Amino acid sequence: MKFALALCAAVLLVVLVQAEEKCTPGQVKQQDCNTCTCTPTGVWGCTRKGCQPAKREISCEPGKTFKDKCNTCRCGADGKSAACTLKACPNQ
């Protein structure tokens, strides 16, 4: 439930910020994994996909598991990538 509320708040913030930014009708831009198109009234309208967090470089022992906040990750065979659960962790 907390995750859903946080997600709604984030979407609302993005929409409010975008509403203040004027644009040329028909203009298109990318914002993270979302596509934004300028409406005929000169206001951005964007898709609201839940984007994956940005990837970061890691170094780990291949095959080993480790914690990332409240999520459990398993190190990839290359020692530079990992697959993690996607729990919404409470503020830590």
Curated annotation (Swiss-Prot):
List each copy of the Pacifastin domain by range: 20-54, 57-92
Q: Which InterPro entries match?
A: Pacifastin_dom (IPR008037), Pacifastin_dom_sf (IPR036201), Prtase-inh_pacifastin (IPR016307)
Q: Where does the record place it?
A: Secreted
Hey, where's the site called Reactive bond on this chain?
Answer: 48-49, 86-87
Task: Specify whether Lipid biosynthesis is a keyword of the entry.
Answer: no
Q: In which tissues is it expressed?
A: Brain and fat body.
- UniProt GO MF annotations: serine-type endopeptidase inhibitor activity
Q: Report which superkingdom the organism of origin falls in.
A: Eukaryota
Sites carrying sugar chains: 65
Q: Which UniProt keywords apply?
A: Cleavage on pair of basic residues, Disulfide bond, Glycoprotein, Protease inhibitor, Repeat, Secreted, Serine protease inhibitor, Signal
| Family matches, as Pfam families | Pacifastin_I
Q: List the disulfide bonds.
A: 23-38, 33-51, 36-46, 60-75, 70-89, 73-84
Q: Name one GO cellular component term.
A: extracellular region
Show which residues constitute the signal peptide: 1-19
User: Does this UniProt record's set of keywords contain Disulfide bond?
Assistant: yes
Entry function: Both LCMI I and II are inhibitors of chymotrypsin and elastase (in vitro). They both inhibit the prophenol oxidase activation cascade.
Q: Indicate the family of this protein.
A: Belongs to the protease inhibitor I19 family.
Name the record gives this protein? Protease inhibitors
What is the originating organism of this protein? Locusta migratoria
